[in-house]
A protein has these predicted regions:
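Short amphipathic alpha-helical segments and their helix-coil junctions
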Residues: 292-307, 354, 418-437
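PAPS-dependent sulfotransferase catalytic core
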Residues: 379-436
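N-terminal segments that mediate ammonia production and transfer
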Residues: 1-52
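Short Gly/Pro-enriched turn/cap motifs at secondary-structure boundaries
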Residues: 17-21, 158, 310, 437-438
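Short, motif-level signal for alpha-helix interfacial/capping segments enriched in acidic residues
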Residues: 323-327, 400
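A short catalytic or substrate-binding loop motif that flags glycine-/basic-rich loops and adjacent residues
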Residues: 21-23, 173, 313, 317, ...
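Short, hydrophobic/amphipathic alpha-helical patches that form generic packing surfaces
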Residues: 3-10, 315-323, 441-457
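ATP-dependent adenylate-handling active sites, centered on carboxylate activation for C-N bond formation
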Residues: 33-34, 45-290, 331-378, 395-396, ...
Length: 463
């Protein structure tokens, strides 16, 4: 649960239920029924991909061609979840060349705010000659569906974008399409997240500067930056950060901390808020039961963390992609009996990217440079060169509405009853505080966990 408040999900194979864990990814569990001997064996590791020589764009293109041929094989209709982003556009373009009956699905928001990408998705669908279906989410639907969504996720995941994932898959099923292709994995494999690129840069600096004079560290860190996205929230955060000077100073201090710790999730304002505040929010007995291990142990490597880029790729795939991305999407798809297929996380495709990364550094190249090179003759320029906006629904509007409807449940709810939260802090969280720099604030994480616990108690009364 402590990890949940840091990451917004419980990193696999751990679970929020004491004494219960999942079978880890890429593991085989065998049970000998003669003597009931149980054995777990890992059968694949990303980091074991052999180094690969060659031109990255060409080799990635070859693997995309192979994967796209396999991914559309089906005896039922196949669709694609399409946003305005590069990853889903790549999946749609390659699948459309091999599946004549492919159709596209997208989600938008009432009032068409700036974050609504339906027009971009529809434009690409027209370009690819794909039938296009859309669904619009309004605040009332979000509020009414909130408890059920948390139940269908199976695990607590404080991702407000989950409403959109579910809506698209439900729409596909209603249109008679039980298989949906998605672009998950592109951001994780090709440095699509600014925070991940920053982590690579800062980890390289940490390795170089651990034994360097402070003056040299300051010269490296205190540089001005432009905002990553053209959005009101991003530009506002950039201004509060004094164009990178504040975060640069924090980086100097971070690099001189635990030498075994990579720079990774600790760049997230949400992670930092949990590290600074959650122990004061927990009940006394709960604090005493928390394992003394730090939440950053996931990205701490006493034996060393080289090579940096490969290790970071594995970390983001083992954490955010696995639980917040793949697992959440799969469960919300199954809620509508829709099979989710993810060509960009095909293991041979992943091995190609990681193998190339062992020979060619790419974290300092423009975001998704290799992927853009691979598809430059497949997608139109207006898709390839579109600035990344970052997928986000109208978060604040939904957040405020959810707390107006359910916030009071935190004051004397399951989390207070079980002493996960102390009563005073639960009352503060019930107000729905949303700091300007937050993506998934502590208040929303608490609300999701409270509703998840209530749903679990409803179906399993003994909890």
């Amino acid at each position: 649960v402590n990890l949940y408040f840091h990451y917004q999900y419980v990193p696999e194979p751990l679970t929020p239920v004491k004494g219960v864990r999942k079978l880890d990814a890429a593991h085989l569990l065998t049970v000998d029924v003669e003597n009931w001997r149980i054995e777990e064996k890992k059968y694949w590791r990303m980091e074991d991909a052999p180094p690969l020589d060659g031109e990255p764009g060409e080799l990635i293109r070859e693997k995309l061609e192979e994967v796209s041929e396999l991914i559309v094989r089906s005896d039922v209709p196949v669709g694609v979840a399409l946003s305005g982003g590069l990853d889903s556009s790549v999946v749609a373009a390659f699948a459309a060349r091999r599946q004549n009956s492919l159709c596209a699905f997208s989600v938008g928001y009432a009032g068409r705010p700036d974050c609504d990408e339906r027009e971009d998705a529809a434009a690409l669908a027209r370009h690819l000659k794909l039938p296009f279906h859309e669904i619009e989410l309004d605040v009332r639907t979000i509020v009414d569906f909130f408890p059920q969504l948390n139940y269908w996720r199976d695990d607590p995941v404080a991702d407000i974008a989950g409403f959109g994932y579910y809506a698209v898959m439900k729409l596909a099923r209603e249109r008679g399409v039980p298989v949906l292709l998605q672009g998950q994995g592109g951001d994780e494999l090709f440095w699509g997240y600014p925070q991940l690129r920053d982590a690579a840069r800062e980890t390289h600096l940490k390795a170089a500067l651990l034994d360097s004079p402070l003056s040299q560290a300051l010269r490296q860190a205190l540089t001005l930056r432009l905002p990553y996205y053209r959005s009101e929230q991003t530009v506002s955060s950039w201004a509060r950060d004094l164009a990178g000077l504040r975060s640069g100073w924090r980086g100097v201090r971070r690099r001189r901390e635990n030498p075994a710790r990579m720079i990774f999730y600790d760049l997230s304002p949400d992670f930092a808020a949990a590290a600074a505040r959650m122990r004061n929010f927990y009940g006394r007995n709960f604090v005493e039961q928390i394992n003394e291990r730090d939440a950053s142990e996931i990205f701490t490597f006493p034996g060393g963390w080289s090579p940096v880029e490969t290790t970071l790729t594995k970390l983001i795939c083992d954490t955010y992609l696995r639980e917040n991305g793949i697992a959440q999407g799969d469960r919300l798809g199954m809620a509508s009996s829709v099979e989710m297929r993810l060509p960009l996380v095909d293991y041979k495709f992943v091995e190609t990217v990681v193998g190339l990364r062992k020979r060619h550094s790419d974290s300092t190249l423009p975001p998704k440079f290799w992927l853009r090179q691979a598809v430059k003759d497949v997608l139109p320029e207006w898709v390839l060169n579109r600035p990344k906006r970052g997928f986000a629904p109208p978060t604040r509007r939904w957040h405020d509405a959810l707390f107006a409807a359910y916030g009071e449940s935190l004051r004397d709810g399951y989390l207070v009853e079980s002493e996960v939260l102390n009563r005073e802090s639960a009352a503060r969280l019930a107000e729905g505080e949303f700091p300007p720099e937050a993506t998934s604030p502590l208040s929303f994480k608490a609300l999701v966990l409270e509703q998840w616990c209530r749903q679990m108690r409803r179906v399993i009364p003994a909890i």
